Amino acid sequence: MAPAALWVALVVELQLWATGHTVPAKVVLTPYKPEPGNQCQISQEYYDKKAQMCCAKCPPGQYAKHFCNKTSDTVCADCAAGMFTQVWNHLHTCLSCSSSCSDDQVETHNCTKKQNRVCACNADSYCALKLHSGNCRQCMKLSKCGPGFGVARSRTSNGNVICSACAPGTFSDTTSSTDVCRPHRICSILAIPGNASTDAVCASESPTPSAVPRTIYVSQPEPTRSQPMDQEPGPSQTPHIPVSLGSTPIIEPSITGGISLPIGLIVGLTTLGLLMLGLANCFILVQRKKKPSCLQRETMVPHLPDDKSQDAIGLEQQHLLTTAPSSSSSSLESSASAGDRRAPPGGHPQARVTAEAQGSQEACAGSRSSDSSHGSHGTHVNVTCIVNVCSSSDHSSQCSSQASTTVGDPDANPSGSPKDEQVPFSQEECPSQSQWETTETLQNHDKPFPLGVPDVGMKPNQPGWYDQIAVKVP
């Protein structure tokens, strides 16, 4: 068999030689000069410009230790540790392997003479900056999709994730860079519908299910209807229907009395306000009743000299006889005699003023005494009184005790009348009179006294004008 094969090979070579194309049996490493316009025959050769010859390249894991020349071919050598050559080359040195992988990277290929070290990002990171060699220079954390969002598509090699909102009927309740939106739970009885971030809740599910049957009472109000008047109300008009429940729990609504609390508070405050208002009105009415119905004020009578006071007494008697002929002469005489007795030794007219002031104490009770005296027999005289004010409680009692009745029966005993009593003028003056009022009285000594309504026609220079101030007979 072997000689036959050799003969076949020889025949083929002869035919090729005859045609002018010769093919060497093996590749010759010796350099050769390429034909003009032609390149080196194979890719494992390179053209050396210095030698102008085609020379062989070094295989992966080796480098060109010596370059070729016209007589010798390229001499190759293996790469040292930590260095490599990955392709056919004619480098004068090997390439260094990449540095060790960082903490966020993982080494996928070790450094060898024929291959560089390869680092890839961790599962929770992606390559943000990739080199031409395929290694990743910088890794970053993957984006995380929050609740309501899910990963739109799976992450590509060294790529970041893309988040998208969950479509209707799906949800995502986690924060993750890998979870996608999941469909809602399908319930026969839906208790709580789901949304983009929560799943649906079925009515048959409960956090603490109870398998023990129990009985509850459901209150149902009766329909409105007319009832007889003699029906006595029972303790409760609402029937209770017992309902037996199985293992399925239900939510029992609790009725609280939260509405009754504000109503009771409002009613209580309203009642308290009305009570306070009533007490205030009662206090005002009591204060109004305590006020006196008649305010007394001491009349300031101008001081007259002695001669004028004597003339005034005489003119008063004459005027009373002239204007009131029907009056009793005995009452006028008693009035005149009382005025003479009460006059001081020096003839000072202050005694007359005191007598007139004493008679004026009955201003408040004058109307009652006059009305009561109409039923009695005798002659009555209506007297216009000048009020004397006593502010103090002690002096008011004193002043009232000194008052004399000017309306009465003229036939009464004159000895029992208070006119016979000698009362000093100092006791008739009220201590409540202010200093200003005293000064005002002294200043009005020579001024005319203001006249009343019946005295408008009488002038101060007419006789008897002063007497009408004390007593006026209609």
Swiss-Prot record:
One GO process term, biological-process aspect: negative regulation of neuroinflammatory response
Transmembrane segments: 259-288
Pfam families to which the protein is assigned, alphabetical: TNFR_c6
Glycosylation sites: T30, N69, N110, N195, T208, T224
GO cellular component: axon; membrane; membrane raft; neuronal cell body; perinuclear region of cytoplasm; varicosity
Residue ranges, Cytoplasmic side: 289-474
Composition-biased stretches (Polar residues): 220-239, 429-442
Organism domain of life: Eukaryota
Disulfide bonds: C40-C54, C55-C68, C58-C76, C79-C94, C97-C111, C101-C119, C121-C127, C136-C145, C139-C163, C166-C181
Ranges where the record places region Disordered: 220-241, 321-378, 397-464
Modified residues (Phosphoserine): S331
Record-given protein name: Tumor necrosis factor receptor superfamily member 1B
Source organism (scientific name): Rattus norvegicus (Rat)
